[in-house]
Structures are given as C-alpha cells and as structure tokens.
C-alpha cells in the first residue's frame, strides 16, 4: 500500500512536519543528555539484558513443573533417606497425609455414604456394562479396583469412581468398528481392555508432564453439547432393552436408531418388557422428585434403582415372566476381578486405532471427572490438584485394564449422591468398592432373573442430569460463537457419531482461536482526562486524542506470519483515513499527522514475518514524513527487534517504555516548537 498518493499537502505543510520532527529529535537528544537522575525510562528499556533462550526456558519448565518438589523446612541436619522416601510417598499417595487424622466420627459418615453409593452403583454398573457391549460383571469389576486405587491417590473427597454412561457409549460406538461384540465377544473384550490401558497411560502421562492444558481443548460449551447429544443417543439405545427388541442397529446416530426401532416394532415383541421398564422408570423419577423437594430424603432417590432391581427381579422370578417373553440378564459370573494381563492386545493390527480410542476416552473421562470434582471441591472450600487427579485416574485405569475393568471416571450422578449422603473423605469409595465386591460373591445368582428393561430404565433415569438446558441458554446469552460450538457437538453426536461430534466441536473451537489470532483488532487509543491511562476511544468516547498523534494498540498476543500483513495493512488504513481527513479539512494541515505510536504491550511474541512487517510499516510511514514510535514492547519482542537491528532503523529514541512517556515527550517537543516559531 502506498500512502504518498494520498499526501497531497502543500510544501509548507511538509516543511512544518520536517521541522516538527527535527524539534522532537532535538528534544529527545537534550533529554538523553540530562543527568542520571532525569534519565528517561526508555533507557531502562533499551538496556535490558537478553531474555532466556528457548533451551533455557525448556529446562526451567522441566525443573519447575515436571521435576517440581514441595519445599520442606530443612533442619541443620540433612533429612534422612527414609524421610525423603516418605515425603515422596505422601506426595504420590495423599491418603498417607490425611489418614493419620482420620477419626471414627468421619468413618460413620463415610460408611453411610459408601453404602448409599453402592446401592446406586450396583444397578448402574450392570446397565453401563451392557451399554458398553460387555457382560454385566465387567461393570461391577470396574466399580471395585479403580475406586480402591483412586482412594489412595486422588485429591477429591466426594468424587465417586466407576463406569459412566458417556464413556460406555464412546467405547461401544468406536470399538465396535474394530470388532463386533456379538460375533466375537472375547476379541471385543480384549480390545476394550487394551483401550483402557492406553487411556490410563495417556492420563498418567498428562499428569506426570503437567499436560493438563490438553484437556482444555474440549471447552465447556463443547462439553455441554457433547454430553447432551450423548445423553439422547444413550436414551435411544435403551429403547432396545425397554421394548425387549431383538433386531437392533449397531449404529449410534439418531436416524439409524429410530429407523431400527420403527422396523423392529413390526416384528413380534412382548409388551411386558415395556410395562416393567416404564413402571419402574416412573418410580425412580418420582423418588428423585421427592429427594429434590426434601434434601433430608436424599436416600430415597439413591436407593430407588436398587429397590427397583430387587422388586423387578422378584416379580420376574415368582411369576415366571421369562416364559412370557420378558428378557432377563441371565448368567453373571460370580467372584472377584480376574487378571486380564494376558488379554491385552499390543500386537493387534489395529493398535494405532486402539491407541486413538484410548486417547479420546482419556480426554473425555478426565474432562468429566475434573469438572465434577472441581465443582464439589468449590462447594466444600478446598482446592483440587488437577495434575494429581490425572495421575490417579491414569494409574487406576492402568490397574483396571489388568484386572478386567474398562475405562472408569468420576460420575456426576453418583458424586451428587455421595455428597448428599454426607461423605467426608474418599473412604466412601472404599466402602462402596467392598460392598460391590461382596455383591459379586453373593448376589450374582439372584441377579440372574433381573429384566433388561429395568436396567434400561435405570440408565434412562440418569440421563436428564447430562442435559444442561440452563447452561446452554447461559452460553447462548453470553457468547454466540461458543453456542455454535455447543450446537456442532450436539448435532454431530446426534446425527453422525460420537467422534464426529467431538471433531466438529474441537475443530470449530480451533477455527475460532485461529480467526481471532489471524484477524486481531487494532484499537485507536485516547488519554483519559487527568490520568496516564490510555483506552480504546470506542469503549471510552470521553478519551482525548492528541493532535498530530495516532496511538494504536495491537490486541493480538502474537505478531506472526499469520497476522503480520493484516496488522500492517490495518495500521496503514488508519493512517490513510487520517490523511484523507486532513486533505478535506484545510484547517488541520498545520496539525497534521506526524507520529504513529504503536502500543505493543499485548504482543508477547514476534517472528520473522512480524519483524519484516514492522520494518515495511516504518519505511512506508517514513516516506510520508511520519515517524513510527514503539511503546511498551515486551522483553522478548524487544530482543527480536534488536537481533533484527530494527531498533537502529527505527532509532532507539523512538522506543518507549510506556505510551504515556511517548505522548508526553511529543507534547513537550511540540510546545517547544511552537515557542520557537
């Protein structure tokens, strides 16, 4: 872009600009020759040392984050090796820290909470295992080992660990593409265990190397949309159990599921399944309504699923309803978790896809668990350690994969029950796990006659908690682009697949970040009266602009190849507009634009393209007798300018520590020039 064609001012006007420039330089030179006590702040800026190199930063990051150790008060004598080992163990296993202060009155509360939690966990675990395409006992296994591991390593006091609906659906939909659970359930189960191992490994790596920011790529809006879409898909999947359908699709999109239901209803089906399932669904929802109306009756909705299972099983057993077409769970293998080390498929031809499913499962499970844990930690007034949570989740899933468990995480519905039941520590998880372990040994024969319709009704009753309508409305009011991410995740899961919904949500989130980085705003600044504060003149219309000055702020944290040309053109366009106004208003010629001050306080980094753009901007402005002044450059930005010798081209006297300093020097020089005239 050329500005010279727009600067059709008189020779007198250009001479005045040149004279003003000389006066400003003379004023700056005089200021530089002042006594040390009056040394300008810009000198402090120019003489700053070099910032740490990339390698020094990397080493510093590893020292402070990866190899970080808590500072302990040191006595005159060095700590013994045993104390050091104990300190490391306490850091890895928080139970060693609070376990010493654990008292009987706390155990009474945790015992009641754990038993209440188990009453909800047992029927839900069986249902979620069915949703994941596994036999019922594997859901119960997942409610034993992972909670026990988490109770020693986790930092949340309320988080209830076990299988959850969303992760179960995720595994079912993605692993099914590699192996059909109907044709070869053993091969399917082996892949699920291997996915669980990779999920745990990724979670442990995230915690070990402080990579928790990766979980943040799934924004709150994306999570709300994903959960809502998954809840509807899960609900539609339960129509198979609720109606007792035999022919049903393996796909998860809403069109395929509804089409399958429509065609299946044309085949013979037994309405008794629907009667049993819908009756107990109404009972569970009614119990939940009572619990919400009176918090003291929290145990009613918590016990309702287990009561439903017991009653439905007795009804089916006593009435011989199986002979009338009611589908039942049938055989549940009794006994404790069996080792599954030899079932992990590390030599599978699908190992890459298995690892990918493990990564997606790890992120979804972590996001849900940390979100739930933090919300209840905030209520209780303590801080959740995100990195320790990742480590705990990782090791519990690795251990789970070796003991016939699939991916476990924190459940919102069970955590809410645990909280309402008055839990004080993670001992409630231990009580729950022991109770489930006993039920595996004692109750499996009784559960043989449990109707599948009751499991479907239990899962359906838990789904409303996954649909956050008020949260979606809040996002709509707050940020329309965030709502677009929510809608993309919701409809992607609903009409395509779980992975497509995730990809759409993450893709739109990235596109939004890229758009804001590539097309940042350039703000024109003015000074607020009687202050040294400079604000956007659009946000603060009362801000005063200084004649002959154009102060602009780059709002992007990076001046790089993606936005350098755009930023340069925007700045030149702003100058062009002012030059055009000067040509139209002859009165303003003697106060024409002489200096462009570029506030770079928001710019954290600059690359080669950014440096070239600044150099081109300087040359373009200089050809029109306009000086480029840089204010508030960050340490690394200034270092890059020095390395490129751009500070010599712009001249160091045109680099200032603050916008206020640059404006004040210009105003003083201008007043001096007028006095000389």
UniProtKB/Swiss-Prot annotation:
It comes from Arabidopsis thaliana (Mouse-ear cress). Coiled coil: none annotated. It comes from the Eukaryota. It is a multi-pass membrane protein. One of its GO terms (cellular component) is membrane. Induction: In leaves by sulfate starvation. Up-regulated after treatment with zeatin, an exogenous cytokinin. It is found in: Membrane. The chain crosses the membrane at residues 111-131, 134-154, 159-179, 191-211, 214-234, 271-291, 297-317, 353-373, 390-410, 423-443, 447-467, 483-503. NCBIfam families: sulP. Expressed in the phloem in roots and in the phloem of vascular bundles in leaves. The keyword Glycoprotein applies. Glycans are attached at residues 250, 418. One of its GO terms (biological process) is sulfate transmembrane transport. This is Sulfate transporter 2.2. Residues 540-666 form the STAS domain. InterPro entries: S04_transporter_CS, SLC26A/SulP_dom, SLC26A/SulP_fam, STAS_dom, STAS_dom_sf. Keywords: Glycoprotein, Membrane, Sulfate transport, Symport, Transmembrane, Transmembrane helix, Transport. Belongs to the SLC26A/SulP transporter (TC 2.A.53) family. Residues 1-110, 155-158, 212-213, 292-296, 374-389, 444-446, 504-677 are cytoplasmic. One of its GO terms (molecular function) is secondary active sulfate transmembrane transporter activity. The lineage of its organism: Eukaryota, Viridiplantae, Streptophyta, Embryophyta, Tracheophyta. Residues 132-133, 180-190, 235-270, 318-352, 411-422, 468-482 are extracellular. Low-affinity H(+)/sulfate cotransporter that may be involved in the distribution of sulfate from vascular bundles to the palisade cells of the leaves. Plays a central role in the regulation of sulfate assimilation.
């Amino acid at each position: 872009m050329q500005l010279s064609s727009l600067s059709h001012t008189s020779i007198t006007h250009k001479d005045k600009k040149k004279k003003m420039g000389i006066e400003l330089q003379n004023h700056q030179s005089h200021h530089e020759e002042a006594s040390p006590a009056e040394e300008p702040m810009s000198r402090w800026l120019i003489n700053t040392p070099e910032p740490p190199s990339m390698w020094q930063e990397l080493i510093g990051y590893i020292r402070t984050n990866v190899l970080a150790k808590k500072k302990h008060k040191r006595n005159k004598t060095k700590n013994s090796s045993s104390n050091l080992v104990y300190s490391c163990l306490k850091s890895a296993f928080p139970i060693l820290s609070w376990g010493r202060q654990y008292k009987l009155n706390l155990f009474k509360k945790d015992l009641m909470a754990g038993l209440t939690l188990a009453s909800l966990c047992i029927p839900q675990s069986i249902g979620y295992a069915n949703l994941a395409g596994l036999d019922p006992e594997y859901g119960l296994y997942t409610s034993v080992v992972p909670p026990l591991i988490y109770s020693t390593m986790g930092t949340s006091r309320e988080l209830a660990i076990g299988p959850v609906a969303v992760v179960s659906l995720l595994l079912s939909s993605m692993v099914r593409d590699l192996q059909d659970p109907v044709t070869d359930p053993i091969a399917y189960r082996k892949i699920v265990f291997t996915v669980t191992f990779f999920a745990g490994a990724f979670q442990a790596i995230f915690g070990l190397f402080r990579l928790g920011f990766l979980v943040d790529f799934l924004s709150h809006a994306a999570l709300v949309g994903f959960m809502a879409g998954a809840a509807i898909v899960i609900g539609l999947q339960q129509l198979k159990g609720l109606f007792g359908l035999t022919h049903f699709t393996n796909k998860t999109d809403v069109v395929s599921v509804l089409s399958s239901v429509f065609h299946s209803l044309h085949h013979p089906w037994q309405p008794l399944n629907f009667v049993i399932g819908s009756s107990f669904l109404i009972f569970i929802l009614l119990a939940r309504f009572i619990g919400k109306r009176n918090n003291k009756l929290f145990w009613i909705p918590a016990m309702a699923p287990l009561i439903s299972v017991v009653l439905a099983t007795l009804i089916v057993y006593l009435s011989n309803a199986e002979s009338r077409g009611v589908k039942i769970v049938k055989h549940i293998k009794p006994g404790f978790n069996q080792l599954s080390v030899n079932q992990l498929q590390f030599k599978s031809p699908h190992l890459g896809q298995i690892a990918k499913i493990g990564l997606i499962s790890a992120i979804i499970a972590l996001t849900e668990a940390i979100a739930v844990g933090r919300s209840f930690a905030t209520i209780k007034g303590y801080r959740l350690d995100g990195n320790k949570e990742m480590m705990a989740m990782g090791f519990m899933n690795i251990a789970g994969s070796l003991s016939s468990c699939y991916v476990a995480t924190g459940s919102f519905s069970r955590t809410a029950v645990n909280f309402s039941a008055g839990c004080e520590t993670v001992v409630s998880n231990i009580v729950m796990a022991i109770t489930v372990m006993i039920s595996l040994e004692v109750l499996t024969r009784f559960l043989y006659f449990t109707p599948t319709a009751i499991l479907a009704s239990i899962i359906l009753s838990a789904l409303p908690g996954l649909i956050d309508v008020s949260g979606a409305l809040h996002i709509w009011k707050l940020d329309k682009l965030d709502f677009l991410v929510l809608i993309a995740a919701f409809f992607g899961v609903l009409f395509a697949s779980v992975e497509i919904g995730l990809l759409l949500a993450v893709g739109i989130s990235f596109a939004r970040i890229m758009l804001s980085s590539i097309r940042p705003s350039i703000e024109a600044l003015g000074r607020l009266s009687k202050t040294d504060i400079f604000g956007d003149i659009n946000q603060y219309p009362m801000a005063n602009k200084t004649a002959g000055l154009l102060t602009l702020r780059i709002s992007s944290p990076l001046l790089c190849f993606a936005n350098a040309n755009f930023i340069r053109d925007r700045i030149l366009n702003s100058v062009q507009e002012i030059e055009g106004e000067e040509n139209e208003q002859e009165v303003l010629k003697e106060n024409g634009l002489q200096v462009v001050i570029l506030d770079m306080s928001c710019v954290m980094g600059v690359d080669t393209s950014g440096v070239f753009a600044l150099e081109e901007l300087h040359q373009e402005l200089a050809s029109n007798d306009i000086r480029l002044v840089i204010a508030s450059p960050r340490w690394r930005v200034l270092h890059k300018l020095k390395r490129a010798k751009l500070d010599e081209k712009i001249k160091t006297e045109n680099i200032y520590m603050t916008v206020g300093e640059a404006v004040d020097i210009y105003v003083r020089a201008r007043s001096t020039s007028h006095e000389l005239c």
